[in-house]
Amino acid sequence: MVLFITLACVCNQFAHAQSTDENISLTITDRNGQALPYATVIVESAGLTYTADAQGRLRLKTALFTTKGTRLTVSYLGKATRQLTITHDAVAKEKKINIALDDNNLYLKDVQVNATRAPRHSNSSMLIQRNTIDNIQAYSLADIVQALPGKAILNTDMHNASFLTLRSALQGDLQNPLDAYSRNKLNDYVRNAAFGIAYVVDGTPLSNNTNMQLDSYGKWGGIKMFDRRFNTDNNENVGSGNDLRLIPASSIESVEVISGVAPAKYGDLSNGAVIINRRAGLTPFYGSVKVQYDIFNASLGKGFALGERWGMLNLNIDYLHSTRDRRDKLKTNANIALNATWTHTISRALAWENTLSADFSKNVDGLKSDPDATLNRTRTDQQNLRLALRGALSPQQNALIDGIDYNFSLSLSHQYDMHEEFIANNRLNLITDAYTNGLHETDVAPPYYTALLEIDGKPLALSANVEARRTLKWSRATHTLSLGVLARHEANHGRGKIFNAETPFYDGGQGGRGDRSYQYRNRIKLNQYGMYLQDKLVLPTAYGTLSTTAGLRLEYQNQRFAASPRINMMWALDNGLSFNAAYGISYKIPATAFLYPENVYFDRLVYSNYSNNANERLFMYKTKVVNPTNPNLLSPYTHSFEVGTAYANANFNTSLTGYLKIDLRGISSEAVLDTMWVQHYETVSQPPNERPFYAPKGDPQLIIDYYFTPRNLLYSRNAGVEWIGNLRDIKPLGLGVNFSVVYNYSLYHQQGERVGTSIDLDKEAVSGIYAPTKNSSHELISTLSLTKQIPTLGLIFNLRLQNFWFRHFNRHGFDIYPIGYIDQNFRRVYLDEQQRKDIRWTYLRLKDNEPVNISQPIIVPNCHLRVSKEIGKQLRLSCYINNVFNYRPWVERQGERIYFNQPPTVSMDVSYKF
């Protein structure tokens, strides 16, 4: 009710507006006149998506149609997407319009197999349709996003967590910054950029906010998981983006990627959005099998008609198995994913369409062991269950509100990581199990034992979003007003980190930082709520149409309020030329891994009296407990700017876009100097079969160590240019050409000072204080896609030529001289420009921090071939070869060859419609 009242107040601002409640009726059918139930219709100028009823019928307000025409996109599973423009005059003459869709196969002309610019929700939107997904023979979303301009085309990798970054040249591996293929190399800059992308599946947000599958943050100074500690597969995506491997490509109908300014309805993001629409429609059984050398993937789906009363049911199943190295049994991957979607009409009078969907996924490879090791076993289990209820209704004529959209979802995951190995306790590993400060008695671990570390997480996410909208006419302008409210609760109800102190991996109190258990349940939680208001303006002018989407999002996150204004503008001229601009601010809530780090336990052995007699044996250690939580941690946010121009006619379209994106308050770990006075003890006497007597040995010793705390330290400024074009048909060759040229530049560094890691208590300056390091990267990447289709044969060839023209990494903007130091009283002392270069502080100067300037020494081209053949209307055979010419240029650096292209990979795909 509050939502309706608020929207009424907004509508009151248009008191003199001409409100029209007239409708037109659309009927969506196939070429045989058979109705297509629950087809999707997108009114692009208004940014609205509608769903037809069980008879393929849909009512639209005539106010949505302008004199210069409104563009509609109509889609249905198994049918070719159709785009058409309908003018207001045509609507006035015909109140009923029939739209027929063709079967989607290779016998149609002009099959699009590339990502295309489609300004639906944003000027920067890129659309990847099902034909493109089939052409690249994608196994998961990780392969699909490689179709985006500027993204390297890589071999499928199911053994490293895959993430996406947009509009940046951030390097994942600073040790080898020119390696475009090290997708598993994460640093804090890349992690923040990937974490800031929102993923929305059929209107339901996917979240990685409460993923806590990590070892101690304060102990290691970042996100450290089993793959780093125990050399297993890299499943690391804590505090990073969603793992794209877990979203199978077989169930996806289309993907819209917003790399610039997203509409106000999308929140909890700072670096763009990925909107995924899955396959749903009335279809026969369809199946697909894809095979590579080390990957097997099978999928099956069907759309069932349940009658007019009960609507339609879609079922999809996907199975994938992969082996990275047949010699290493710890590195296999097997997953299964199930999806069921039920769509039905609740009320035809209200045009109330409702959809209930259920998703379940699980890895099924179970416990993995190394047969060559005495005992070395690892297990990574991940189960996900997601339930979503979404729908839309359009009240009758003369209602205050044109439509209401709603989306409610529940997501529950079980994440489990385990590693165990046999330990021969030759070093007398100690048992350190104290959770409090002070001295503690202990004993040595058994001579032989199995060390076990488990991390058990159960992320829970509840979300709700309700949006009401109203379309109004004011003179020649059309306003589509939207008002939404949202709420989101997330928590982690897992057992947490489970560690048996009596069977340690490391050397307990002799090693500094010890392992402890850490419970997640009733501790890890996030709450967000807010509202947004948006106006979509469409104004016909003498020379074209002006469209503006302006919105304001107000939300409460991380115990603070945030306001995000956003605007997308476009002026489309009648001659096909258009100009656009956009600006927006967006906020991303910090991950719980940063908000709720576990305590750090500094354990120091102070007394040792070993004996084979358990009554005489005694060890003591001192524990200091540190809480690394930063209560002042803020949400990272981004300013995004964008300008561009585009041109389109019947056979050719192109766009040129420039962007500037400033990321502020990115999260990284800061080393904090910690001091601990330790008094050692020595044995005074040893009575037979009794505890020893001990006394202090010498003076207390000062122990210096570090722990790590999360802070808003990172800054990055990203700028670039994107040129994209598409030529449908070069006659008489019948060749389609799609190209993209992308230049990205990124400047990224930490803000504030940093403390050196070298400590010397005998010096006047215990440790140095230095200016932050700065890095910059830029790159130029082009992709040329050549498509030859022979519709009469159902045959299509696609050749993708990708060039890395240059990649450059520069570390600069600092010097080797300290800006200050920490004295023996552990106070900070700062130096002026003359003092910092004094020979008195020579020992504080950095020796390994000279500026680095690395450039790609050669131009690196690559070529990839795809071939698909339709046999009849049921069977499709496909093959693709990455690096088809096996061109692998290399350079030698420090006696080692560095290759710039991956080895060739061949994949086969067989699809069949029963």
Role assignments for model-derived ranges:
Residues D227, I662-R665, S669-A671, N803-N825, ...:
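C-terminal beta-signal and adjacent terminal beta-strands/loops
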